[in-house]
Amino acid sequence: TACKTGTTDSPADSPAASVPDADTPVPFLTEDEFPRLDGSTACIPLMAQMKADATGMDLLEAQTSITVSTTAYAWENFGLWSRSDSEDYGAQLLIVYEAPEYVKEELAEADAKLEQKAIGRDALVFIVNEENPVQSLTQQQLRDIYAGRITSWKDVGGADSPIVAFQRGVDSGSQTLFKKLLIDKGDGQLMAAPTELAPADMGGLVDSIAEYNNSANAIGFSVYYYIDQMYSKPGLRLLAVDGVTPGNDTIADESYPLCNEFYAVVHADAAPDSPQRKVYDWLDTDEGRRCIEKAGYVAVD
């Protein structure tokens, strides 16, 4: 059965900055030995940093070698189609955000044998035009906006203009987090988004908010790492939620209320001496955590 494919994202569209670290990593794999990766768009820079640190290859070269099939498709392909002992087919290690519920159900029905662990923390963030005077919204105000109960910015301290609320498709990792962290913790009500307000990829959502004809009226969401370091756009800014502005510090201490972890995943039967298992285990070491932080993410213990 052929693999499913989503929007294939690559770092050519998502440049990542890396801060040099005083602790020089010790390579433990060759470039050819490094496991095949897949996962979420927002994890591309981390995958590149992992490959550079684990093999000693140049970071820019590592960036050009990473492509992903995006969150839902990565989980499906990995859990339903690929095998740990395949030498030339499918990913061997995922670096990925949480799977959508329907994918979790598919994996459970297939009795997929996967092993996963949290390696980092990110956050769901809300994006508005910098001309919008609203600086912070409560979680309940956000729920009411996306349920269609609040329809004007004047009801949350802004201008007397309609709120244009963008969403993502059901396959996206950010839509999964949006539902889990916000909508499902309320009454679960979510208005349907017309196609033009549900771009296929995160870059498209950011572009749409920036370019919308009445852009000061628009609101959308992403994960913090993507909007902060991979696809920042002039004229946009992040909202505080419950008065807390998202940032590495407020995500690390979880004072920002909409945080969630992301994962490394291997097949449960991956051999102890396999490259994917070596990298999976390495992510728990001090050097592995430094790699995560060097790439700009928040590592978890």
What is the role of each PLM region?
Residues 6-11:
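Bacterial Sec signal peptide processing site at the extreme N-terminus
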Residues 15-301:
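Exported/periplasmic ABC-transporter solute-binding proteins
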